[in-house]
C-alpha cells in the first residue's frame, strides 16, 4: 500500500485521481459534500477506469496536491 499519493487529474466521472509511489492509480469516490475521502484502486490501473478495490478506512496516505508544493495528510 502506498504511503504517498500524488494528484494527477480528474477522470471522466469527475473523480479525483491519484498515483502512488508504486505507479498504482487510486480515486476518491466522494465527489461532493463535506464527507471524508473514500479511496479505491482503479480497475486495471486505468485512469478513466471504474473504482475497483476499497482501501481500508484506516488508510491515511500523505497527499501531494495538484500544485505539487504542499503535502497534506487527510
Where are these regions (language model features)?
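Cysteine-centric segments in proteins
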Residues: 1-74
Amino acid at each position: 500500500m502506498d504511503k504517498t499519493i500524488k494528484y494527477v487529474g480528474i477522470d471522466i466521472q469527475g473523480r479525483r485521481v491519484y498515483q502512488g509511489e508504486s505507479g498504482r492509480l487510486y480515486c476518491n469516490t466522494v465527489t461532493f459534500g463535506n464527507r471524508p475521502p473514500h479511496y479505491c484502486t482503479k480497475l486495471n490501473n486505468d485512469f478513466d477506469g471504474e473504482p475497483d478495490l476499497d482501501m481500508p478506512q484506516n488508510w491515511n496516505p500523505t497527499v501531494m496536491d495538484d500544485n505539487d508544493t504542499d503535502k497534506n495528510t487527510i
